[in-house]
Amino acid sequence: MERRTEKIGIFAPGMMTPEQYRLLLTPEVRRTVEEQIGRDPAAIALDKRIPHAALVATQVKYLARARTKLPSYYEARCILPPLAFEQASSEACAARKSCSGERVLDLTCGLGVDALYLSKRFREVITLERDATVSYTHLTLPTIA
């Protein structure tokens, strides 16, 4: 796997840069992603009228996949870094984890799916994520009932 050092952490294919994440937080790009949901990501990527078309296409692709794997994340329109999405537990799997207690430590937090569901059964959930960009995802996390 190709790896190169960035100012923040390690960058590898499939990872999202901090700059891309910040772009996805802007109202203009969030609105564009919302307008493109349901379209073919390949068509979006090739559409020269769409600013940041490749980035928008990637988010539309992963939001479409999130409808079944991470429905709360889809509804909240969370930003989904591709590699983190691929490595994430599904909400259905996370909801079935049966442990409970006072405190739990999630050393590979990623998108926080397991932590989100563990928070229903533990008084305190501590999460660690080595990819700084993925850790930004917690700014857009959904809430679950």
Where are the predicted features?
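Conserved SAM-binding loop of SAM-dependent methyltransferases across substrates and taxa
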Residues: 111-122
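S-adenosyl-L-methionine
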Residues: 11-101
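Conserved small/polar residues in nucleotide/adenosyl-binding loops
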Residues: 137-143
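Conserved class I S-adenosyl-L-methionine
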Residues: 103-108
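N-terminal amphipathic/basic-hydrophobic helices that include classical n-h-c signal peptides
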Residues: 1-11
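Conserved SAM-binding motif I beta-strand of class I
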Residues: 124-129
